[in-house]
Protein backbone atom coordinates (compact mmCIF):
# COMPACT_ATOMS: atom_id res chain seq x y z
CA UNK A 1 0.00 0.00 0.00
CA UNK A 2 1.36 3.43 -0.88
CA UNK A 3 0.16 6.76 0.49
CA UNK A 4 0.90 9.91 -1.49
CA UNK A 5 0.12 13.56 -0.91
CA UNK A 6 0.15 16.29 -3.52
CA UNK A 7 -0.52 19.98 -3.74
CA UNK A 8 -3.95 21.05 -4.92
CA UNK A 9 -4.32 23.13 -8.02
CA UNK A 10 -4.80 26.90 -7.80
CA UNK A 11 -7.64 27.67 -5.37
CA UNK A 12 -10.96 28.42 -6.99
CA UNK A 13 -12.37 31.90 -7.03
CA UNK A 14 -14.78 32.21 -4.14
CA UNK A 15 -13.19 29.34 -2.24
CA UNK A 16 -12.62 29.76 1.47
CA UNK A 17 -9.34 31.36 2.38
CA UNK A 18 -8.86 30.14 5.94
CA UNK A 19 -5.46 28.68 6.72
CA UNK A 20 -6.98 26.02 8.96
CA UNK A 21 -10.06 24.01 8.14
CA UNK A 22 -10.79 22.04 11.29
CA UNK A 23 -10.33 23.20 14.86
CA UNK A 24 -7.68 21.36 16.84
CA UNK A 25 -10.22 19.05 18.46
CA UNK A 26 -11.42 18.15 14.94
CA UNK A 27 -15.10 17.99 15.82
CA UNK A 28 -18.39 19.77 15.62
CA UNK A 29 -18.07 21.59 18.92
CA UNK A 30 -19.50 21.47 22.41
CA UNK A 31 -22.88 19.91 22.95
CA UNK A 32 -25.60 22.30 24.02
CA UNK A 33 -28.17 21.41 26.63
CA UNK A 34 -31.78 22.20 25.88
CA UNK A 35 -32.99 23.50 29.21
CA UNK A 36 -36.67 23.37 28.44
CA UNK A 37 -38.49 20.86 26.28
CA UNK A 38 -40.52 23.45 24.40
CA UNK A 39 -37.95 26.25 24.25
CA UNK A 40 -35.69 27.47 21.47
CA UNK A 41 -34.63 26.00 18.13
CA UNK A 42 -37.75 26.93 16.20
CA UNK A 43 -38.65 25.18 13.02
CA UNK A 44 -37.69 25.59 9.47
CA UNK A 45 -39.55 23.76 6.77
CA UNK A 46 -39.66 20.02 7.40
CA UNK A 47 -37.15 18.58 4.95
CA UNK A 48 -35.68 21.85 3.75
CA UNK A 49 -31.96 22.51 3.84
CA UNK A 50 -30.64 24.90 6.47
CA UNK A 51 -28.92 28.20 5.93
CA UNK A 52 -25.20 28.70 6.30
CA UNK A 53 -23.47 28.39 9.66
CA UNK A 54 -24.24 31.96 10.53
CA UNK A 55 -27.98 31.54 10.13
CA UNK A 56 -30.51 31.46 12.91
CA UNK A 57 -31.37 28.19 14.66
CA UNK A 58 -34.90 28.47 13.32
CA UNK A 59 -33.58 27.93 9.80
CA UNK A 60 -32.13 24.49 10.48
CA UNK A 61 -34.13 21.29 10.11
CA UNK A 62 -34.26 19.18 13.25
CA UNK A 63 -33.58 15.48 13.63
CA UNK A 64 -35.20 13.96 16.71
CA UNK A 65 -33.67 10.90 18.40
CA UNK A 66 -36.37 9.08 20.33
CA UNK A 67 -36.83 5.64 21.86
CA UNK A 68 -37.03 3.81 25.17
CA UNK A 69 -34.39 4.15 27.89
CA UNK A 70 -31.07 2.41 27.19
CA UNK A 71 -31.97 1.83 23.55
CA UNK A 72 -28.74 3.53 22.44
CA UNK A 73 -29.84 7.02 21.35
CA UNK A 74 -27.08 9.01 23.05
CA UNK A 75 -24.46 6.45 22.01
CA UNK A 76 -25.45 6.90 18.37
CA UNK A 77 -25.12 10.68 18.63
CA UNK A 78 -21.74 10.51 20.37
CA UNK A 79 -20.22 7.93 18.00
CA UNK A 80 -21.41 9.54 14.76
CA UNK A 81 -20.94 13.24 15.51
CA UNK A 82 -18.41 13.38 18.36
CA UNK A 83 -16.02 10.56 17.42
CA UNK A 84 -16.52 8.75 20.72
CA UNK A 85 -15.20 5.20 20.75
CA UNK A 86 -18.06 2.66 20.86
CA UNK A 87 -16.51 1.11 23.97
CA UNK A 88 -16.64 4.45 25.79
CA UNK A 89 -20.41 4.68 25.34
CA UNK A 90 -20.81 1.99 28.01
CA UNK A 91 -20.15 4.73 30.59
CA UNK A 92 -22.74 7.21 29.29
CA UNK A 93 -25.48 8.07 31.75
CA UNK A 94 -29.14 7.86 30.81
CA UNK A 95 -30.56 11.03 29.29
CA UNK A 96 -33.06 12.72 31.61
CA UNK A 97 -33.49 15.98 29.70
CA UNK A 98 -33.72 17.01 26.08
CA UNK A 99 -30.25 17.70 24.71
CA UNK A 100 -29.78 19.79 21.59
CA UNK A 101 -26.69 19.26 19.43
CA UNK A 102 -25.99 21.85 16.76
CA UNK A 103 -24.39 20.31 13.66
CA UNK A 104 -23.50 23.34 11.56
CA UNK A 105 -19.89 23.12 10.45
CA UNK A 106 -20.54 22.73 6.74
CA UNK A 107 -22.73 24.43 4.20
CA UNK A 108 -25.36 21.70 4.02
CA UNK A 109 -24.73 19.04 6.70
CA UNK A 110 -26.38 21.66 8.82
CA UNK A 111 -29.07 20.70 11.31
CA UNK A 112 -29.92 20.14 14.95
CA UNK A 113 -30.13 16.78 16.70
CA UNK A 114 -32.43 16.59 19.70
CA UNK A 115 -31.79 13.65 22.02
CA UNK A 116 -34.93 12.87 24.02
CA UNK A 117 -35.16 11.00 27.34
CA UNK A 118 -36.57 7.50 27.11
CA UNK A 119 -39.94 7.98 28.80
CA UNK A 120 -41.36 11.04 27.11
CA UNK A 121 -44.94 11.71 28.19
CA UNK A 122 -46.85 13.28 25.31
CA UNK A 123 -49.83 13.84 27.58
CA UNK A 124 -47.87 16.04 29.97
CA UNK A 125 -49.46 19.52 29.58
CA UNK A 126 -46.02 21.16 29.98
CA UNK A 127 -44.67 19.30 26.93
CA UNK A 128 -45.43 21.24 23.76
CA UNK A 129 -44.95 18.39 21.28
CA UNK A 130 -46.79 20.25 18.52
CA UNK A 131 -44.17 23.00 18.46
CA UNK A 132 -41.32 20.47 18.39
CA UNK A 133 -42.79 18.27 15.66
CA UNK A 134 -43.78 21.25 13.53
CA UNK A 135 -40.14 22.21 12.99
CA UNK A 136 -38.74 18.72 12.51
CA UNK A 137 -37.24 17.30 9.33
CA UNK A 138 -36.78 13.70 10.48
CA UNK A 139 -37.76 11.59 13.48
CA UNK A 140 -35.47 8.65 14.28
CA UNK A 141 -36.97 6.06 16.62
CA UNK A 142 -34.39 3.68 18.08
CA UNK A 143 -35.44 0.13 19.01
CA UNK A 144 -33.15 -2.20 20.96
CA UNK A 145 -33.16 -5.42 18.91
CA UNK A 146 -31.67 -7.42 21.79
CA UNK A 147 -34.53 -6.57 24.15
CA UNK A 148 -38.25 -7.27 24.13
CA UNK A 149 -39.47 -4.68 21.64
CA UNK A 150 -43.24 -4.90 22.19
CA UNK A 151 -43.29 -1.84 24.46
CA UNK A 152 -41.03 -0.03 22.01
CA UNK A 153 -43.47 -0.73 19.16
CA UNK A 154 -46.32 0.68 21.25
CA UNK A 155 -44.35 3.85 21.96
CA UNK A 156 -43.31 4.04 18.30
CA UNK A 157 -46.94 3.99 17.20
CA UNK A 158 -47.95 6.71 19.69
CA UNK A 159 -44.98 8.88 18.73
CA UNK A 160 -45.26 8.72 14.94
CA UNK A 161 -49.06 9.04 15.05
CA UNK A 162 -48.88 12.31 16.96
CA UNK A 163 -45.97 13.59 14.87
CA UNK A 164 -47.68 12.76 11.56
CA UNK A 165 -50.83 14.66 12.52
CA UNK A 166 -48.75 17.75 13.33
CA UNK A 167 -46.26 17.50 10.44
CA UNK A 168 -47.11 14.98 7.68
CA UNK A 169 -44.03 16.07 5.67
CA UNK A 170 -41.66 14.71 8.31
CA UNK A 171 -39.45 11.69 7.50
CA UNK A 172 -39.94 8.75 9.86
CA UNK A 173 -36.91 6.49 10.36
CA UNK A 174 -36.67 3.38 12.56
CA UNK A 175 -33.23 2.19 13.69
CA UNK A 176 -33.35 -1.47 14.70
CA UNK A 177 -30.29 -1.05 16.89
CA UNK A 178 -27.69 -3.24 18.64
CA UNK A 179 -27.87 -5.94 15.97
CA UNK A 180 -24.14 -6.70 16.33
CA UNK A 181 -25.00 -9.45 18.82
CA UNK A 182 -27.49 -11.18 16.50
CA UNK A 183 -26.91 -13.78 13.82
CA UNK A 184 -27.68 -12.87 10.21
CA UNK A 185 -30.86 -14.96 10.23
CA UNK A 186 -31.99 -13.40 13.52
CA UNK A 187 -31.37 -9.90 12.13
CA UNK A 188 -33.56 -10.56 9.10
CA UNK A 189 -36.31 -12.15 11.18
CA UNK A 190 -36.26 -9.29 13.72
CA UNK A 191 -36.47 -6.66 10.99
CA UNK A 192 -39.30 -8.50 9.25
CA UNK A 193 -41.27 -8.86 12.51
CA UNK A 194 -40.83 -5.20 13.55
CA UNK A 195 -41.66 -4.01 10.03
CA UNK A 196 -44.83 -6.11 9.92
CA UNK A 197 -46.09 -5.18 13.40
CA UNK A 198 -45.39 -1.45 13.02
CA UNK A 199 -47.15 -1.20 9.66
CA UNK A 200 -50.09 -3.29 10.88
CA UNK A 201 -50.56 -0.87 13.79
CA UNK A 202 -50.52 2.08 11.39
CA UNK A 203 -53.02 0.38 9.07
CA UNK A 204 -55.37 -0.31 11.99
CA UNK A 205 -55.21 3.40 12.88
CA UNK A 206 -55.94 4.47 9.31
CA UNK A 207 -52.44 5.86 8.76
CA UNK A 208 -51.51 3.90 5.64
CA UNK A 209 -49.93 7.01 4.08
CA UNK A 210 -47.38 7.25 6.90
CA UNK A 211 -44.17 5.68 5.59
CA UNK A 212 -41.58 4.18 7.93
CA UNK A 213 -38.02 3.45 6.79
CA UNK A 214 -36.19 0.66 8.64
CA UNK A 215 -32.44 0.23 9.15
CA UNK A 216 -30.36 -2.42 10.93
CA UNK A 217 -27.72 -0.54 12.91
CA UNK A 218 -24.85 -0.98 15.34
CA UNK A 219 -22.24 1.45 16.67
CA UNK A 220 -19.60 -1.29 16.41
CA UNK A 221 -19.53 -1.25 12.61
CA UNK A 222 -20.26 1.18 9.78
CA UNK A 223 -23.99 0.41 9.63
CA UNK A 224 -24.88 3.37 11.85
CA UNK A 225 -22.99 5.75 9.53
CA UNK A 226 -24.68 4.20 6.50
CA UNK A 227 -28.12 4.63 8.09
CA UNK A 228 -27.46 8.22 9.17
CA UNK A 229 -26.22 8.98 5.66
CA UNK A 230 -29.59 7.93 4.25
CA UNK A 231 -31.42 10.05 6.84
CA UNK A 232 -29.35 13.17 6.18
CA UNK A 233 -29.58 12.80 2.40
CA UNK A 234 -33.35 13.20 2.61
CA UNK A 235 -32.81 16.62 4.21
CA UNK A 236 -30.57 17.91 1.41
CA UNK A 237 -32.63 19.57 -1.33
CA UNK A 238 -29.59 19.63 -3.63
CA UNK A 239 -29.23 15.82 -3.53
CA UNK A 240 -30.43 15.17 -7.13
CA UNK A 241 -27.95 17.77 -8.41
CA UNK A 242 -25.10 16.20 -6.45
CA UNK A 243 -25.93 12.72 -7.72
CA UNK A 244 -26.08 14.00 -11.28
CA UNK A 245 -22.70 15.71 -10.96
CA UNK A 246 -21.16 12.53 -9.55
CA UNK A 247 -22.63 10.42 -12.36
CA UNK A 248 -21.17 12.77 -14.97
CA UNK A 249 -17.80 12.83 -13.22
CA UNK A 250 -17.32 9.05 -12.91
CA UNK A 251 -18.63 8.28 -16.40
CA UNK A 252 -16.09 10.65 -17.96
CA UNK A 253 -13.20 9.62 -15.71
CA UNK A 254 -13.28 5.82 -15.70
CA UNK A 255 -14.15 5.67 -11.99
CA UNK A 256 -16.16 2.75 -10.57
CA UNK A 257 -17.63 4.39 -7.46
CA UNK A 258 -17.52 7.82 -5.85
CA UNK A 259 -18.72 9.12 -2.48
CA UNK A 260 -19.04 12.71 -1.31
CA UNK A 261 -18.16 12.54 2.39
CA UNK A 262 -18.64 14.86 5.32
CA UNK A 263 -15.17 14.25 6.74
CA UNK A 264 -15.95 14.86 10.41
CA UNK A 265 -18.83 12.40 10.72
CA UNK A 266 -17.96 10.08 7.77
CA UNK A 267 -21.54 10.46 6.58
CA UNK A 268 -21.73 10.36 2.81
CA UNK A 269 -24.11 13.05 1.67
CA UNK A 270 -24.23 11.85 -1.93
CA UNK A 271 -22.99 9.07 -4.19
CA UNK A 272 -23.47 8.10 -7.81
CA UNK A 273 -26.50 6.13 -8.97
CA UNK A 274 -24.82 2.70 -8.86
CA UNK A 275 -25.74 0.51 -5.84
CA UNK A 276 -23.80 1.09 -2.64
CA UNK A 277 -21.65 -1.87 -1.62
CA UNK A 278 -21.14 -1.91 2.15
CA UNK A 279 -17.55 -3.10 1.79
CA UNK A 280 -16.74 -0.24 -0.57
CA UNK A 281 -18.28 2.25 1.85
CA UNK A 282 -16.28 0.81 4.76
CA UNK A 283 -13.11 0.97 2.67
CA UNK A 284 -13.68 4.66 1.95
CA UNK A 285 -14.41 5.39 5.62
CA UNK A 286 -11.19 3.64 6.62
CA UNK A 287 -9.29 5.69 4.05
CA UNK A 288 -10.54 8.92 5.61
CA UNK A 289 -9.36 7.69 9.02
CA UNK A 290 -5.93 6.81 7.62
CA UNK A 291 -5.52 10.16 5.87
CA UNK A 292 -6.56 12.16 8.94
CA UNK A 293 -4.38 10.08 11.29
CA UNK A 294 -1.30 10.38 9.06
CA UNK A 295 -1.96 14.11 8.58
CA UNK A 296 -2.23 14.63 12.33
CA UNK A 297 1.20 13.01 12.76
CA UNK A 298 3.09 14.55 9.85
CA UNK A 299 0.96 17.44 8.62
CA UNK A 300 0.83 19.68 11.67
CA UNK A 301 3.45 22.24 12.64
CA UNK A 302 5.83 21.75 15.56
CA UNK A 303 3.65 23.86 17.84
CA UNK A 304 0.61 21.72 16.97
CA UNK A 305 -1.02 24.39 14.84
CA UNK A 306 -2.44 23.76 11.41
CA UNK A 307 -5.12 21.37 10.26
CA UNK A 308 -5.30 17.67 9.48
CA UNK A 309 -7.57 18.44 6.54
CA UNK A 310 -7.37 21.56 4.40
CA UNK A 311 -7.61 22.79 0.82
CA UNK A 312 -4.40 20.97 -0.15
CA UNK A 313 -5.51 17.58 1.16
CA UNK A 314 -5.15 14.79 -1.36
CA UNK A 315 -4.29 11.12 -0.93
CA UNK A 316 -3.82 8.03 -3.09
CA UNK A 317 -3.86 4.51 -1.68
CA UNK A 318 -3.00 1.64 -4.00
CA UNK A 319 -4.20 -1.78 -2.85
CA UNK A 320 -2.60 -5.08 -3.83
CA UNK A 321 -5.63 -6.11 -5.92
CA UNK A 322 -5.07 -3.33 -8.52
CA UNK A 323 -7.69 -1.13 -6.83
CA UNK A 324 -6.88 2.53 -6.24
CA UNK A 325 -8.52 4.75 -3.61
CA UNK A 326 -8.37 8.44 -4.46
CA UNK A 327 -9.29 11.21 -2.00
CA UNK A 328 -9.49 14.91 -2.86
CA UNK A 329 -10.65 17.92 -0.87
CA UNK A 330 -13.84 19.47 -2.29
CA UNK A 331 -14.86 22.05 0.30
CA UNK A 332 -13.93 22.95 3.83
CA UNK A 333 -15.65 19.89 5.27
CA UNK A 334 -16.23 17.72 2.19
CA UNK A 335 -14.03 15.15 0.50
CA UNK A 336 -14.54 13.13 -2.66
CA UNK A 337 -13.42 9.52 -2.27
CA UNK A 338 -13.23 7.44 -5.47
CA UNK A 339 -12.67 3.76 -6.17
CA UNK A 340 -11.10 2.90 -9.52
CA UNK A 341 -8.84 0.39 -11.25
CA UNK A 342 -5.11 0.93 -11.63
CA UNK A 343 -5.32 1.04 -15.42
CA UNK A 344 -7.93 3.83 -15.21
CA UNK A 345 -5.69 5.78 -12.84
CA UNK A 346 -3.01 5.97 -15.53
CA UNK A 347 -5.10 8.85 -16.94
CA UNK A 348 -4.63 10.87 -13.76
CA UNK A 349 -4.39 14.13 -15.69
CA UNK A 350 -7.85 13.57 -17.15
CA UNK A 351 -9.24 12.66 -13.71
CA UNK A 352 -7.70 15.75 -12.12
CA UNK A 353 -9.10 18.03 -14.82
CA UNK A 354 -12.58 16.54 -14.49
CA UNK A 355 -12.31 16.80 -10.71
CA UNK A 356 -11.48 20.50 -11.03
CA UNK A 357 -14.70 20.97 -13.04
CA UNK A 358 -16.65 18.90 -10.51
CA UNK A 359 -15.23 20.82 -7.55
CA UNK A 360 -16.04 24.14 -9.18
CA UNK A 361 -19.63 22.98 -9.76
CA UNK A 362 -19.99 21.95 -6.10
CA UNK A 363 -18.77 25.37 -5.00
CA UNK A 364 -21.32 26.98 -7.29
CA UNK A 365 -24.12 24.83 -5.87
CA UNK A 366 -23.42 25.74 -2.26
CA UNK A 367 -21.51 29.01 -2.69
CA UNK A 368 -18.97 27.86 -0.15
CA UNK A 369 -17.22 30.71 1.60
CA UNK A 370 -18.94 33.45 -0.43
CA UNK A 371 -21.19 34.46 2.44
CA UNK A 372 -21.90 33.22 5.94
CA UNK A 373 -25.38 34.67 6.03
CA UNK A 374 -27.79 33.49 3.33
CA UNK A 375 -31.55 33.80 3.32
CA UNK A 376 -33.20 30.37 3.54
CA UNK A 377 -35.68 31.40 0.88
CA UNK A 378 -32.87 31.90 -1.63
CA UNK A 379 -32.57 28.94 -3.99
CA UNK A 380 -29.17 28.51 -5.66
CA UNK A 381 -29.38 27.41 -9.26
CA UNK A 382 -27.63 24.12 -10.08
CA UNK A 383 -24.71 24.51 -12.49
CA UNK A 384 -23.70 22.17 -15.24
CA UNK A 385 -20.23 20.74 -15.64
CA UNK A 386 -19.05 22.85 -18.54
CA UNK A 387 -15.92 21.94 -20.47
CA UNK A 388 -15.66 18.51 -18.85
CA UNK A 389 -13.09 16.36 -20.61
CA UNK A 390 -14.02 13.00 -22.07
CA UNK A 391 -11.13 10.78 -23.18
CA UNK A 392 -8.83 13.77 -22.78
CA UNK A 393 -10.76 16.10 -25.10
CA UNK A 394 -12.33 19.21 -23.53
CA UNK A 395 -15.72 20.21 -24.82
CA UNK A 396 -17.97 23.18 -24.30
CA UNK A 397 -20.90 21.49 -22.58
CA UNK A 398 -22.23 18.10 -21.58
Curated annotation (Swiss-Prot):
Task of the protein: Guanine nucleotide-binding protein that plays a crucial role in the cellular response to amino acid availability through regulation of the mTORC1 signaling cascade. Forms heterodimeric Rag complexes with RagA/RRAGA or RagB/RRAGB and cycles between an inactive GTP-bound and an active GDP-bound form: RagC/RRAGC is in its active form when GDP-bound RagC/RRAGC forms a complex with GTP-bound RagA/RRAGA (or RagB/RRAGB) and in an inactive form when GTP-bound RagC/RRAGC heterodimerizes with GDP-bound RagA/RRAGA (or RagB/RRAGB).
Sites of Phosphoserine modification: 2, 15
Superkingdom of origin organism: Eukaryota
Summary of activators and inhibitors of this protein: The activation of RagC/RRAGC is mediated by a GTPase activating protein (GAP). In high-amino acid conditions, activated by GTPase activating protein FLCN that stimulates RRAGC GTPase activity to turn it into its active GDP-bound form. In response to amino acid depletion, the GATOR1 complex inactivates RagC/RRAGC by securing the GTP-bound inactive form.
Source lineage: Eukaryota, Metazoa, Chordata, Craniata, Vertebrata
Protein name (Swiss-Prot/TrEMBL): Ras-related GTP-binding protein C
InterPro entries, alphabetized: Gtr1_RagA (IPR006762), P-loop_NTPase (IPR027417), RagC/D (IPR039400)
Tissue and organ distribution: Expressed most abundantly in kidney. Moderately expressed in brain, ovary, and testis, and detected at lower levels in heart, liver, and muscle. Not detected in lung, spleen, and small intestine. Widely expressed in tumor cells, with expression being specifically up-regulated in highly metastatic cells.
Positions annotated to bind GTP: 73, 89, 95, 180
Subunit structure: Forms a heterodimer with RRAGA, in a sequence-independent manner, and RRAGB. Heterodimerization stabilizes proteins of the heterodimer. The GDP-bound form of RRAGC (in complex with the GTP-bound form of RRAGA or RRAGB), interacts with RPTOR, thereby promoting recruitment of mTORC1 to the lysosomes. Component of the lysosomal folliculin complex (LFC), composed of FLCN, FNIP1 (or FNIP2), RagA/RRAGA or RagB/RRAGB GDP-bound, RagC/RRAGC or RagD/RRAGD GTP-bound, and Ragulator. Interacts with NOL8.
Sequence positions that bind GDP: 70-75, 177-178, 180, 219
PTM annotation (Phosphothreonine): residues: 95
Entry GO MF terms: enzyme-substrate adaptor activity; GDP binding; GTP binding; GTPase activity; GTPase binding; molecular adaptor activity; protein heterodimerization activity; protein-membrane adaptor activity
Entries under CDD domains matching the protein: RagC_like
Enzyme Commission number: 3.6.5.-
Region annotation Disordered: where it falls in the sequence: 1-56
Similarity section: Belongs to the GTR/RAG GTP-binding protein family.
Gene that produces this protein: Rragc
Chain segments annotated as transmembrane: none
Record-level GO BP terms: cellular response to amino acid starvation; positive regulation of TOR signaling; positive regulation of TORC1 signaling; protein localization to lysosome; protein localization to membrane; response to amino acid
Compartment(s) where it occurs, according to its Swiss-Prot or TrEMBL record: Cytoplasm; Nucleus; Lysosome membrane
Signal peptide (from-to): none
UniProt xrefs under SUPFAM superfamilies: P-loop containing nucleoside triphosphate hydrolases
Reaction(s) catalysed (UniProt annotation): GTP + H2O = GDP + phosphate + H(+)
Species this protein is from: Mus musculus (Mouse)
Transmembrane helix found in the keyword field: no
Comp. bias regions, Gly residues: 39-55
N-acetylserine modified-residue sites: 2
Amino acid sequence: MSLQYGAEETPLAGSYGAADSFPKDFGYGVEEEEEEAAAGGGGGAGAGGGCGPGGADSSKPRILLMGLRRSGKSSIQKVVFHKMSPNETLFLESTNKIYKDDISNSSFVNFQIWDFPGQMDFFDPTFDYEMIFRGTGALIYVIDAQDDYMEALTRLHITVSKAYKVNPDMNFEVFIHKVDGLSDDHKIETQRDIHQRANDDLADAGLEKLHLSFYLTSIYDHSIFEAFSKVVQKLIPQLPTLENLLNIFISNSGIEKAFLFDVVSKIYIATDSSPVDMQSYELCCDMIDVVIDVSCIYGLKEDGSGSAYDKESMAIIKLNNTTVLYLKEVTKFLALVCILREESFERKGLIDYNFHCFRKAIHEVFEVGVTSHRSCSHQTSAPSLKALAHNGTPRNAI
